[in-house]
């Protein structure tokens, strides 16, 4: 859902120079396609904010035409990120900056040019193959621990001994493993 908010009261403020870029806050002086990697990263993880019209040092520069810039940002996101991320755009009228707030998405991974991104402190980087697989599972609402284990010939002698010592469970069976979410009848043992 995309929302334009023309904000006449809320202002980023003159003290923005005290603010620094973080894992969830990015400054962009102008609108270039590089912000799309950050939109992917924010959608894939914890969300975040990109403020356009502010340089890397936190100095407000403003944008020449904030309304047109807002439309440009929306079009770039809609044309370049798949699936469609959840975001809002706010024009800060008193300093001609634009605040893009990106929510963490549910349909992960969010891709820009067929690649998924994440934030590493203040940098945006491409995820590796393992992390990409984890994002796919998360997008399907599946955790690694819920996947069937490739090796179904497992023994739980140490677990049995510890359960016996700590909480006096003497009867160790598949029902015990089901209770611990380590086994189900359909898929057998899981990760």
Outline where the language-model segments fall.
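Polybasic/polar functional segments that serve as interface/processing modules
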Residues: 1-50, 54-116, 150, 173, ...
């Amino acid at each position: 859902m995309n929302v334009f908010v023309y904000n006449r009261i809320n202002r980023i403020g003159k003290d923005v120079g005290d603010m620094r870029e973080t894992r969830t806050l990015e400054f962009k002086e102008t609108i270039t396609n590089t912000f799309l990697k950050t939109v992917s990263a924010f959608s894939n993880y914890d969300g975040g904010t990109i403020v356009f019209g502010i340089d890397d040092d936190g100095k407000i520069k403003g944008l020449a035409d904030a309304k047109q810039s807002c439309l440009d940002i929306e079009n770039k996101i809609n044309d370049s990120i798949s699936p469609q991320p959840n975001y809002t755009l706010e024009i800060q009228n008193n300093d001609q900056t634009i605040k893009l707030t990106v929510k963490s998405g549910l349909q992960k991974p969010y891709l820009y040019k067929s690649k998924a991104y994440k934030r590493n402190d203040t940098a945006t980087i491409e995820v590796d193959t393992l992390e990409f697989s984890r994002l796919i599972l998360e997008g399907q609402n599946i955790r690694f621990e819920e996947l069937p284990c490739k090796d179904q010939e497992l023994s739980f002698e140490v677990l049995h001994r510890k359960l016996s010592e700590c909480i006096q469970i003497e009867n160790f069976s598949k029902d015990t493993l089901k209770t611990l979410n380590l086994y189900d009848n359909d898929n057998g043992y899981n990760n």
